[in-house]
């Protein structure tokens, strides 16, 4: 894919710099990565969800009715987001810290 800058450089007889070549290669890699994300089928996501839940369930009791696993894309980055409400640890009560907006630790 030739950019306008590449076309002007070619018409003026300038050689392509290694920076331009590297930039073009990086753009191809990024485009390839984006295409690969589209290959995540519903079946594959379901398998990933099941495996994640199986691993987490070894250590904590999960509220399976409230579990949500999704793919979210923002600014060319795709993230697998898993919201797993935890009832308690397998050995007993769950212990955790919450941090409020003023960065003060609140223990529950």
UniProtKB/Swiss-Prot annotation:
Family named by the database record: Belongs to the MinE family.
Highest taxon above the source species: Bacteria
Functional description taken from the UniProt entry: Prevents the cell division inhibition by proteins MinC and MinD at internal division sites while permitting inhibition at polar sites. This ensures cell division at the proper site by restricting the formation of a division septum at the midpoint of the long axis of the cell.
NCBIfam families for this protein: minE, PRK00296.1
Gene Ontology BP term (one): cell division
UniProt keyword list: Cell cycle, Cell division
The protein, known as: Cell division topological specificity factor
SUPFAM superfamilies on file: Cell division protein MinE topological specificity domain
Source species of the chain: Prochlorococcus marinus (strain MIT 9215)
């Amino acid at each position: 894919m030739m950019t306008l800058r590449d076309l002007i450089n070619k018409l003026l007889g300038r050689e392509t710099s290694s920076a331009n070549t590297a930039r073009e290669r990086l753009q191809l890699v990024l485009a390839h990565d984006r295409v690969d994300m589209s290959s995540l089928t519903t079946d594959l996501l379901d398998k990933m969800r099941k495996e994640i839940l199986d691993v987490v369930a070894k250590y904590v009791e999960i509220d399976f009715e409230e579990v949500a696993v999704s793919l979210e894309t923002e600014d060319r980055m795709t993230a697998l987001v898993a919201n797993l409400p935890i009832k308690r640890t397998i050995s007993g009560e769950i212990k955790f810290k919450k941090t409020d907006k003023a960065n003060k630790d609140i223990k529950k």
